């Protein structure tokens, strides 16, 4: 009888521990990292107005428990991103929103080089079991049609090759509206960021759902 009582007590304790552990895992917010350049960093904006901050607030307003670290660096290129990817996105990150290439295009860097760097980052994240949401960029018109034809398809091609969700153009809805831009006519203002968040939300929400399904 004593053995049965001890065994029963042991089972109760184990069940309680497992239940508590499961609840703790369920309560843990999804941890994302926004990894990119000035468009991700929030150039000349207060930290609370950046894309990552506004996106986190919008997701939480919909009841989605998430934290989004801002690993955007103004002026960063794909080669700069590749050099810092491992330490900017720590192990244990649930997912990374990868946005780089705008400065490559502005500087006329070879699209083939940009694609190679982005692919190396994607492969590195995947080897660390960190899901990737890829954010697309388009070459500015002043770079010419030939450059655009080589640069613009990069993101779709990488998304298809690596099975990634893709948000095709980060500045969709902003790039042609000066009221949503800073005076430099290159970077979004606070209202512009809000438009970017609104337009990208469905893609980000689907990405988070995929992360949740993979963690079960």
Q: Where do the protein language model's features map onto the residues?
A:
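Alpha-helical cap/lid subdomain in secreted, periplasmic
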Residues: 27, 54, 64, 80-216
